[in-house]
C-alpha cells in the first residue's frame, strides 16, 4: 500500500512536466524589435498547427530575445533561432515537433521552421526573402507571414552569408557570434501583441 501511494504521488509530480505546449490562438501577431527596426509577423495556426504552437511557446518564454540573425542570404532566407545561452539551447535541442503538412507555399515574407529531416524542427526559423517554392516539396511548412517591416528584414546585415558555424553557436552562444561576427543584426525583443 505504501509503495502504491508513493507511485501515485510520484505520478502527480511527473505528469505536469510531460504536459503539451500551450495551444496557440487561431491567429496572433508577434512584434519583433531588432537592431535594424521593427517588423511584425502574423501567425495562422491552421497553416501549420505544430509550428504555430511551438513558435507561440518560444516567443512567450523570451527564447528569441537577443538572438542573432546568423544566416542572411539575400534573395533567399534570413535565419535565426539559436538561443544566446548554450545551456538554454541544449535544453531545447532534443524537443522536436512533428512535421506539419505544407499548406502554404514558401513565398517572400513567409516564416517557417528550419528542419534537417522528418520531424526534426526545434527552435530555428527563417523568413523567405524571395519566392522559394522548391522548399515546399522539402517539407518546409510556413505558419505565418511578415505583415509589416519586410523592408527591415531585407536590410539585415548579410556580409557574413552562411559563414557562422551553427555548431559553435550552439556550444558558445552569443559569445562566439559577438567575437567572430560583430556586425550581425539581432532581435532585441519578440513579443506577442495583445
Regions found by a protein language model. Name each.
Residues 7-16:
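Bacterial N-terminal signal peptides
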Residues 15-194:
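Cyclophilin-like peptidyl-prolyl cis-trans isomerases
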